[in-house]
Amino acid sequence: MTSSIECQNIFRSLQLLDLFIKIGVKNLILCPGSRSAPLAIAAGELYKYGILNVFNSIDERSAGFHSLGISTASGDISLVVTTSGSAVGNLLPAAVEADRSCKSIVFITADRPLRLKNCGSNQTVNQEAFLNSVCRSTLSTNLNGIHKNNDDDILKIVKMIKKQLLQSPGPIHLNIPFEKPLDISLKNKRKTLKVFETLYLNKTCKFLKQNEQNKSIHFSKRIFESLDLSNSGIIIVGPYQGSIKDLVSFNNSLEKIQSITGWPVFADPVSGVSADLRGLVENWELIIKKNNNVIKCNQILRLGPLSSSNNLEKFLSDFDGIQILVKENNRRKLDPIKKSLEYEFGLTNFVNQLLGTYSDDQKKKKPLINLVKVLRREGQKISKILNEQIFLNKEITEYKLANFVPKIWPENYPIMLSASSPIRDWLTFSENGTLTRKCFSFRGASGIDGTLSLALGIARITQPLLLVTGDLALIHDINGFLIENSIDLNLTVLLINNNGGNIFNNLYKNNLEKEELKKLFLMPKSINWENLAKAFQVPIKIVSDLNKLPESFEWSLSMQKSVIIKVDINVDNEMKERSLILKKILNN
């Protein structure tokens, strides 16, 4: 093979991406640009070989979130490739969420060589530092250009990335300087591909595996001695942060700990907990709000981060007993109330270590403790009120959707809840309806950013998918529909149109004038959603009767592509009804 720069640029790009494939990468999101041309050409060839899925996105911000959705739903590392300059800055929102959600993405950014840095060269910035604050590692190939790297250099980089992501899943930034020429002649490309196919394409490489990583799992005597599983306690399961590939093991371990304790389980809608787990309590968030005095115990086992519930946070803050917090894939502090002992090696390791200290007799299944029966009675009272009130009229409200939708969307089909109101409403009103399926929400940074692109990424892996979102969250990321073939993915968007950020009505309405509230917080846009959907070639249906939702879902599933079901919310009626039903529950 010729050693010309153009050949080396392509060859090293092929080698790099092929090594990523060998560590499990299946999907790459490609953004437009010239400096990244060698990576784009290499990705195109690997796509032709049938070993890499490549999807293009003209918006780097959407691309980052789309890749995050793919990584979350698959459990695999995903790649994003961009050109230089501000393109890299647009990756930051997705990198922030990937960091906090502990999901593995490698952002590969093309750059100018060192000779063009800090001298005013066009589109040349300190992009290598843009993502530093949120990435697990920031790496670079040779600063003078990737053509200066050898085989071992490229292999070493990929091995470092694999090891880092096994130890601490999250985003990694790989910055790659390219010297011109960035294109390659057809003749030289054929020569380069022949060498690559002969020497590298089918070459096997040994990489660190999950069970081989040198990860020190400590036995915390203080934590295990603090728990007394023979006495009453509660298991509270927050949003699941582990890999979806580990979810079965997580649920098996949860089943073991519940079995030997008989404790009640409070499960977040996106906890990943199986619906058939013994000890589950419905309406637990409302029970805490109504009367947490019925919860008589002195220890709590918390799994994962805190749910989006002020009632739960207050309950835990006031709780005087022992709190143990078990984390998945997350070594940072996760307890904002600062009252727990934290264990960072995951529930499976926690249970294995704990049971290793128990006798066979102690490991036997125990009946449900009396507290479960008490809490379930309270939950049933609340369910009775909800079932009575929800169909008193046909008007659609947000809390009705949270209760009704998980009952009518097919129970084995996944759901994604956008941040802001939906995740909070479903926590309060869904009656554990999400636990029959995979349910996703991105709570790492708790923003509405990237909602549609995330959902489309999930839908590439697991579909049909239902996205439940407010209007501002959807319009904020409407560019997601520009990602390659995204409108052909089987995604139903349930658009809750309240013409603004309705969550702020609950927070600030009492102390602001109506117009002031609109301008400063609600920010209504009065979008013509029918015209907007048409512009993106996405079918849309408008539903105003709650009883018509089941047939609307039948329609959306029959379309087998991206569609929008829009429901308009009368905000004033919503708030009145919500207030009345909560009052009835709390006073019952």
Curated annotation (Swiss-Prot):
CDD domains: TPP_PYR_MenD (cd07037), TPP_SHCHC_synthase (cd02009). Transmembrane segments: none annotated. Pfam families: TPP_enzyme_N (PF02776). GO terms for molecular function: 2-succinyl-5-enolpyruvyl-6-hydroxy-3-cyclohexene-1-carboxylic-acid synthase activity; magnesium ion binding; manganese ion binding; thiamine pyrophosphate binding. Binds 1 thiamine pyrophosphate per subunit. Signal peptide: none annotated. It comes from the Bacteria. SUPFAM superfamilies: Thiamin diphosphate-binding fold (THDP-binding) (SSF52518). One of its GO terms (biological process) is phylloquinone biosynthetic process. The keyword Protein biosynthesis does not apply. It catalyses: isochorismate + 2-oxoglutarate + H(+) = 5-enolpyruvoyl-6-hydroxy-2-succinyl-cyclohex-3-ene-1-carboxylate + CO2. Keywords: Magnesium, Manganese, Metal-binding, Thiamine pyrophosphate, Transferase. Its EC number is 2.2.1.9. Pathway: Quinol/quinone metabolism; 1,4-dihydroxy-2-naphthoate biosynthesis; 1,4-dihydroxy-2-naphthoate from chorismate: step 2/7; Cofactor biosynthesis; phylloquinone biosynthesis. Its cofactor is Mg(2+); Mn(2+); thiamine diphosphate. Catalyzes the thiamine diphosphate-dependent decarboxylation of 2-oxoglutarate and the subsequent addition of the resulting succinic semialdehyde-thiamine pyrophosphate anion to isochorismate to yield 2-succinyl-5-enolpyruvyl-6-hydroxy-3-cyclohexene-1-carboxylate (SEPHCHC). Homodimer. Belongs to the TPP enzyme family. MenD subfamily. This is 2-succinyl-5-enolpyruvyl-6-hydroxy-3-cyclohexene-1-carboxylate synthase.
